[in-house]
Amino acid sequence: MIGAGISGLTAAWQLRKAGVRVTVLERSDRIGGRFHSIELNGCRVEAGANFLSAAYRVVPFLAGELAVPLQAVSAKSAIAYGGEIYGFRTDRPTSAVRSGLLPIGTSLGQLPGLLRFTARSRGRGTLDPLDWLDLDRMTAEDWTRGIGLAQLAERSIYPAFHGFYFQDARTVSAAAIGAMAAHGFSSRTLTIPGGLSRLTDALASRLDVRTGTTVAFVEEDAFGVAAHTDSGVFRAEAAIVAVPAPDLPAVMDLTAQEEAVSAVAYSTGLLVCLGMARRLHEDELAGAYGVLMHPDDGPLAALCVASRAGHARGRGDVVTCMFAGKDARALSGGADSEIVDAARRALLVWEPRLSGAFAPAPEASAVVRIPHAMPTTPPGRLAAIDAYRERAQTRRIVLAGDCLAWPWSDSAAAAGRWAAGRVQAVIDRP
């Protein structure tokens, strides 16, 4: 198993439960991939994936298996649209109408479109991209306009996709928007007490994981599979490779189908965790745990407040400012102090009352650069995944990871589960 992110660890755990001996090789000194929790300013802060959803299927099942508790964050959320922050409650969908985000006339006008979406999404899941293959060639903007959801998309779906996945949803495949929306508009947001890393740590503690092991190349040979590393050659009946798509060409010779899925572009993320000298007041940032930004509303993709996830222990707080796309790329090359200053300015545009609340110590804030944050889903991407999965039936080296998944963690975990099933079939093959 090459790669110890959520996809690789899920695959390894699935195989281990089936009685297969698995060794996990991880290049970095840390396991977990996008699950990365850190201590900062008296808070537990997520320096990668920030939340889970009650609509997820694989990750909550893993948490239950491993006795890792889940807890709901504040139900207060917000969307920034047209220069205004609209607060609402995820457990009360009508609150989006009362807030002005979805005016009553707009909401009523979108009902036929919602009925069309419900009918067309019936029987489709949120884990497997191929459930939505028929929408692969159409852009989200064309699709939402065609089914009569243009205004709902503009005011809620596009800000949500941008805030969650650091991408302009108008140009992605209609399939991606449909799958995200199929999670449900009122799903509760979840976290793990002590941070999301508790789950990947729990998985790793039950597996043979070798961190700090760089895989130079993996190949099929006459005896099975050989992984050439800086600490020797590992031989096995089969291998799963769950690394970011841009890393795949360096570690293996790719078939045409593997090359196609590895060509996926990734969104760029820049997380700036700003330490605050006090907890945020209830009316600041609309009282929301997270604020999701429309792609036309400035450089930020989202804001997230640690105390409203139950992650603040002392009197301070942390507000995470998430930059995406060209803004993330432009800022990432600067010094951390410059990036922190830029994040403070961006935050004050939305909440000027925080101008005197920043913790002054440099160590109270942190900058996290994520050059390959999440896979994008342009029209046509799912056809490449479909072609790869058909070809993978005959391979001893199987891909997993987010190159085969939607940009959310539950789908990456499901890709690991799928890869484990393919490897099990290889091992059991006469």
Q: Where on the chain are the PLM-derived regions?
A:
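Mid-domain catalytic core of redox enzymes
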Residues: 18, 216-332, 350, 389
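Mobile amphipathic helical/loop "lid" adjacent to a hydrophobic cofactor/ligand pocket
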Residues: 59-60, 64, 69-171, 183-185
